[in-house]
């Protein structure tokens, strides 16, 4: 008499269901909650977006660039996304693209006139857009070419503004990763604290959230 395999194996079915439940709740829910809790406890500032507050009011994020049009402020890199957090992107234009070359030429002339420097002295980062369009940093050189304009607009000595730039310059992470950089929002808020910036009022610092 021949034997046949059972059409239904309750033990295997039960094991599959238990594995599915564990995967769903154990890895999908519990792991996420634990990871979120640990992150919030150890890195509370970063976990909430590295928000920057002035007088308990959120004025932006240390991780996201925002536009500054007032001459009293250092200005960030150009943005293809127009500094819109929901539209982060670069232009994706090739270096040979005529539109890109024309825009760079126009921006070079604009920045040179704005900051009172020779066109060839304009750093490349002030002409080109970052990959995300939201890069919050400048190189020290990108900030230094703006010192004269900012100092004149605020009635501050250039040496005072230069010292603020130096103080705001961050070293490479762990001394190895990246390049020296200046967070534009942090520098502009430091300027307001230094004076002639009407800090806490209509100070040109856009509330990003």
UniProtKB/Swiss-Prot annotation:
The chain crosses the membrane at residues 18-38. Part of the high-affinity ATP-driven potassium transport (or Kdp) system, which catalyzes the hydrolysis of ATP coupled with the electrogenic transport of potassium into the cytoplasm. This subunit acts as a catalytic chaperone that increases the ATP-binding affinity of the ATP-hydrolyzing subunit KdpB by the formation of a transient KdpB/KdpC/ATP ternary complex. It is a single-pass membrane protein. Belongs to the KdpC family. Coiled coil: none annotated. Keywords: ATP-binding, Cell inner membrane, Cell membrane, Ion transport, Membrane, Nucleotide-binding, Potassium, Potassium transport, Transmembrane, Transmembrane helix, Transport. One of its GO terms (cellular component) is plasma membrane. Pfam families: KdpC. Its main location: membrane. This is Potassium-transporting ATPase KdpC subunit. One of its GO terms (molecular function) is P-type potassium transmembrane transporter activity. It is found in: Cell inner membrane. The system is composed of three essential subunits: KdpA, KdpB and KdpC.
